[in-house]
């Protein structure tokens, strides 16, 4: 299988997000890379599903809570920016204060 660097990056994000989901399901608190991967994957998949940028910006704030992540992670993740592919092209999705 021959993947472009962009495709490799997307695949890595989804693998990391899958691991984060498993750890979260086991009751473990997520670290910074795991939380970032989970949020990024949520935004990429939402764009693929045809959700709007505005909808994803709002919904992205409800993916994780402070109880889901390790201490200090919410402060490190002031915002998450993802270039996502929507049905009508690629757009930048920014979620400010993603961890409520």
Swiss-Prot record:
InterPro entries: Urease_gamma (IPR012010), Urease_gamma/gamma-beta_su (IPR002026), Urease_gamma_sf (IPR036463), Urease_subunit (IPR050069). SUPFAM superfamilies: Urease, gamma-subunit. It is an enzyme of class 3 (hydrolase). Its EC number is 3.5.1.5. GO terms for molecular function: nickel cation binding; urease activity. It catalyses: urea + 2 H2O + H(+) = hydrogencarbonate + 2 NH4(+). It is found in: Cytoplasm. Pathway: Nitrogen metabolism; urea degradation; CO(2) and NH(3) from urea (urease route): step 1/1. Gene3D superfamilies: Urease, gamma-like subunit. One of its GO terms (cellular component) is cytoplasm. Keywords: Cytoplasm, Hydrolase. CDD domains: Urease_gamma (cd00390). Coiled coil: none annotated. It comes from the Bacteria. Pfam families: Urease_gamma. Heterotrimer of UreA (gamma), UreB (beta) and UreC (alpha) subunits. Three heterotrimers associate to form the active enzyme. HAMAP family: Urease_gamma. NCBIfam families: PRK13241.1, urease_gam. This is Urease subunit gamma. The gene is ureA.
């Amino acid at each position: 299988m021959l993947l472009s660097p962009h495709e490799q990056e997307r695949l890595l994000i989804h693998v990391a997000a899958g691991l984060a989901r498993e750890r979260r399901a086991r009751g473990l608190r997520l670290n910074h890379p795991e939380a970032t991967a989970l949020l990024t994957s949520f935004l990429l998949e939402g764009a693929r599903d045809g959700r709007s940028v505005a909808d994803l910006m709002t919904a992205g704030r409800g993916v994780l809570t402070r109880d889901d992540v390790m201490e200090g992670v919410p402060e490190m993740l002031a915002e998450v920016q993802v270039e996502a592919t929507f049905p009508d092209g690629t757009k930048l999705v920014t979620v400010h204060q993603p961890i409520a």
